[in-house]
């Protein structure tokens, strides 16, 4: 069997109706568009969100919030991720080398999620209270 010899089962693919091909086809003349009006014209129709002149929903509702630029360069690291880092020192460069965070990340915080299995030294990262306790309980240390 070859890919170029495969074909769908007989009768499983029904041909689409061809529009504007005579009265007997059932879709001749107006081709399913009805008579006149904006939607019958070529390229006709209203833009997305248009409600016939009524104030549209997206303009009735208030704007809110913003996207923090700092959030784009900040990452959360789980305790379980620390096991994937080569060596005993965990810092930004080690996390980037292990593909745990992206290259654009400038700040990171270790959070208590999962468990740390070996002693590691966390350098230059922020650490939550729970994560700090877990790292120190495993024999590791945190350097600011």
Curated annotation (Swiss-Prot):
Region Disordered: start-end pairs: 1-54
Keywords: Ribonucleoprotein, Ribosomal protein, RNA-binding, rRNA-binding
GO terms under cellular component: cytosolic large ribosomal subunit
PROSITE patterns hit by this protein: RIBOSOMAL_L15 (PS00475)
Biased segments, Gly residues type: 21-31
BP-aspect Gene Ontology terms: translation
Cross-referenced Pfam families: Ribosomal_L27A
InterPro entries per the UniProt record, alphabetical: Ribosomal_uL15, Ribosomal_uL15/eL18, Ribosomal_uL15/eL18_sf, Ribosomal_uL15_bac-type, Ribosomal_uL15_CS
A GO molecular-function descriptor: rRNA binding
Function of the protein: Binds to the 23S rRNA.
Quaternary data: Part of the 50S ribosomal subunit.
Protein name (Swiss-Prot/TrEMBL): Large ribosomal subunit protein uL15
Biological source species: Klebsiella pneumoniae subsp. pneumoniae (strain ATCC 700721 / MGH 78578)
Gene for this chain: rplO
């Amino acid at each position: 069997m070859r890919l170029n010899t495969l074909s769908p089962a007989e009768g499983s693919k029904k041909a689409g109706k061809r529009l504007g091909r005579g009265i007997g086809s059932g879709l001749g003349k107006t081709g399913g568009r009805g008579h006149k009006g904006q939607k019958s014209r070529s390229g006709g129709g209203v833009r997305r969100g248009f409600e016939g002149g009524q104030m549209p929903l997206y303009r009735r509702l208030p704007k809110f919030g913003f996207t923090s630029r700092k959030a784009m360069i900040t990452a959360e690291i789980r305790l379980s991720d620390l096991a994937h880092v080569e060596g005993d020192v965990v810092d930004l460069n080690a996390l980037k080398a292990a593909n745990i965070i992206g290259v654009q990340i400038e700040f990171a915080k270790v959070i208590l999620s999962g468990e740390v299995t070996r002693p590691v030294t966390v350098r230059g990262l922020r650490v939550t209270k729970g994560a700090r306790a877990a790292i120190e309980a495993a024999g590791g240390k945190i350097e600011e």
